[in-house]
């Protein structure tokens, strides 16, 4: 239904971003690896989206390019993997990092992601490897994977709280999220920086 949005960023509350298109505000869930690349509030952004309809909600998931969206759609076809878990997977790893982990059968790397146990990791490897064979070889080499070090927004007083809330939204338990953030917290860090560093440290 809604495959692409081009509009002005109104608010960024990781992992959610509010984009205004033609006077309508769309709330979009984005993996943190994509969220890092968004421009600041007030600037224009283009987001490729996947629309999910549930009994209790209609949700938009957003990505910086079609390759990331394709990988997300393949992930949610896997038994036991829903949109929330797929979002967490692509927040902990970039698209290319995930593809590499699957191709190398790195179960140990996958089980470090929230919500991924050994059985789910093994199932992902088996099912996703088969799917990759039917896709173009360069499908999952998006440019976004090369720009994870882009500048984050200025630090705010509640950056740590925002970072903890984002990690909880991605599937980490509150106590675990707090511990992850406290390990890498520093006064001058923005919430996006804290989230990025906490996820990297977890892997």
UniProtKB/Swiss-Prot annotation:
Name recorded for this polypeptide:
Holliday junction branch migration complex subunit RuvA
Q: What happens when the gene is disrupted?
A: Sensitive to radiation, filamentous growth after transient inhibition of DNA synthesis, little effect on conjugal recombination in wild-type strains. Increased sensitivity to mitomycin and UV light. Suppresses lethality in recB-recC and dnaB temperature-sensitive mutants.
Assigned GO CC terms: cytoplasm; Holliday junction helicase complex; Holliday junction resolvase complex
Residues binding DNA are 78-85, 114-117, 119-120, 123
Residue segments, region Domain II: 65-142
Organism encoding this protein? Escherichia coli (strain K12)
Q: According to the UniProt record, where is the region Domain I?
A: 1-64
Q: What does this protein do?
A: The RuvA-RuvB-RuvC complex processes Holliday junction (HJ) DNA during genetic recombination and DNA repair. The RuvA-RuvB complex plays an important role in the rescue of blocked DNA replication forks via replication fork reversal (RFR); RFR and homologous recombination required for UV light survival can be separated. The RuvA-RuvB complex promotes Holliday junction (HJ) branch migration. RuvA binds to HJ cruciform DNA, conferring on it an open structure. In the presence of RuvB, ATP and Mg(2+) the junction is dissociated; hydrolyzable (d)NTPs can replace ATP but other analogs cannot.
């Amino acid at each position: 239904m809604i495959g692409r949005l081009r509009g002005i960023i109104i608010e960024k509350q990781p992992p959610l971003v509010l984009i205004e298109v033609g006077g309508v505000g769309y709330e979009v869930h984005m993996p943190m690896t994509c969220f890092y690349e968004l421009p600041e509030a007030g600037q224009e952004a283009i987001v490729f989206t996947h629309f999910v309809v549930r009994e209790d909600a209609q949700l938009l998931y957003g990505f910086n390019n079609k390759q990331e969206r394709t990988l997300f759609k393949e992930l949610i076809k896997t038994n036991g993997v829903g949109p929330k878990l797929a979002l967490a997977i692509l927040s902990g790893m970039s698209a290319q990092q995930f593809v590499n982990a699957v191709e190398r059968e790195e179960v140990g790397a996958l089980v470090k992601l929230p919500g991924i146990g050994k059985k789910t990791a093994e199932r992902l490897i088996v099912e996703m490897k088969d799917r990759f064979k039917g896709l173009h070889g360069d499908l999952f080499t998006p440019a976004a994977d090369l720009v994870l070090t882009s500048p984050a927004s200025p630090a705010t007083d509640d950056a740590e709280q925002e970072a903890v809330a984002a990690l909880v939204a991605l599937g980490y338990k509150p106590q675990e999220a707090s511990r992850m953030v406290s390990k890498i917290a520093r006064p001058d860090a923005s919430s996006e920086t804290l989230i990025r560093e906490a996820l990297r440290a977890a892997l």
